[in-house]
Amino acid sequence: TIPIVDEFDTSGAYTHGDGIRLTYASFIPETKQNKTPLIIWLHGGGEGGTDPTIPLIANKAYNYASPEIQKYFEGAAVLVPQTPTRWMHGVSSNYTRGQEDDIYHKALMGLIQNFVKNNPSIDHDRIYLGGCSNGGYMTLKLLIENPDYFAAGYISSLAYHNEFVTESQLLRLKNIPIWFVHAQDDAVTEADKTATPLFKRLKQLGNNNVYYSLFDHVIDISNQYGGKNYLYNGHWSWVYLHANQVFYD
């Protein structure tokens, strides 16, 4: 067991009006603030199911409740929703990269709004949404559909293909702070088809709060798993994100 995981409530469940049921884990900090920010993490394609401890542990999303991260916010609530399948489950296909709607974004938005409603200490002006791969797709989808709801987005190994982001959708993202994290050798969600061109379009549009950390490779910076300079799969750029090793110079 990982002690910090035990600080999460993993019994959360939400059923939307369309019948879709989503599970979730959550963390509410002890803080002196009257209002606390909310950090939302959306898992990747391999962490679906009905056990929210899976997305908590698989990509170390529990780190958002760690003292290292919490100190930046003087306490922040954490919400980790889970889909029974994958966020990119299309309405007419098993997999959408943005060419059609997915079946989950409305239910997920309902879950988030319901959670915020039931936790009145959450600051509506400081709701931060992020995710990796499948969850990166869904992060971008929710930012497009709800541009005035979230304070910022942070996306690792984006799976939403740039070619399917229309000009009108891009305009909705113009004023949203977004940080993309990707690896150039990501063979699953290729940077040149996803984050790189989208970042350039947002900069050209005039979004002055869009940032991009593009790594050559994903290396075991902890030296605990593969050893010094061990190369991870290039898709795993969230390793840097959850180790708090993504900086803007």
What are these model-derived regions, one by one?
Residues E30-T31, G90-S133:
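Gly/Ser-rich "nucleophile elbow"/oxyanion-hole loop immediately N-terminal to the catalytic nucleophile
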Residues L38, G45-K106:
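Active-site machinery of serine-nucleophile hydrolases
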Residues T1-L38, A76, L198-K200, V210:
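A domain-start/cap signature at the N-terminus of enzymes
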Residues L42-G44, S157, H182-A183:
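The conserved beta1-alpha1 loop
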Residues P37, A76, R126, A151, ...:
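Alpha/beta-hydrolase fold active-site loops
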Residues V116-N119, H124-R172:
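Primarily recognizes the serine-hydrolase "nucleophile elbow" in alpha/beta-hydrolase
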Residues V181, D185-V188, K193-F199, K203-D249:
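C-terminal catalytic histidine-bearing segment of alpha/beta-hydrolase fold enzymes
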Residues L173, W179-H182:
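Short beta-strand/loop motif that positions the catalytic acidic residue
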